[in-house]
Design a protein with these regions (language model features):
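ASCE RecA-like P-loop NTPase motor cores
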Residues: 1-124
Length: 124
């Protein structure tokens, strides 16, 4: 499977082995910068696949968080959470549709139950 080849390639890189080693030794928080937005989902999936710890991925804005969440859903459709910033909602528009509110509540419940591997949110 192509995904396995990607993960195997990453495992052979000293930089990623170093990241895994630091996390395993509880050296946290850990900041990984310099990644392209398209690489974030790959790295998050790699870390999630190699560690038995929950991962929190914080992006710089809401749009980036949603894109990263969508990319991660490809790898782990049932194990990724996205908590949308409540302040970005348009209350007048959403007054008739409670769909977004329901998704947020479901995500918060899953967060409380620790029913996830990767949590994606923005710093906003």
């Amino acid at each position: 499977m192509q995904e396995d080849i990607f993960l195997l390639n990453l495992q052979n890189k000293t930089e990623f082995s170093s990241v895994l080693g630091n996390i395993s030794q509880n050296k946290s928080p850990l900041l990984i910068n310099g990644l392209l937005s398209s690489q974030r989902a790959h790295i998050a999936h790699y870390l999630s696949a190699n560690l038995e710890k929950k991962l929190v991925l914080v992006t710089s804005n809401e749009i980036e968080a949603e894109r990263t969440y969508t990319d991660l859903e490809f790898y782990n459709p049932d194990r990724v959470l996205f908590i949308k910033n409540e302040e970005t909602r348009f209350y007048a528009i959403e007054a008739k549709d409670r769909k977004e509110e329901s998704k947020r509540i479901e995500s918060l419940i899953r967060l409380a139950q620790e029913d996830y591997d990767i949590l994606v949110l923005s710093i906003e």
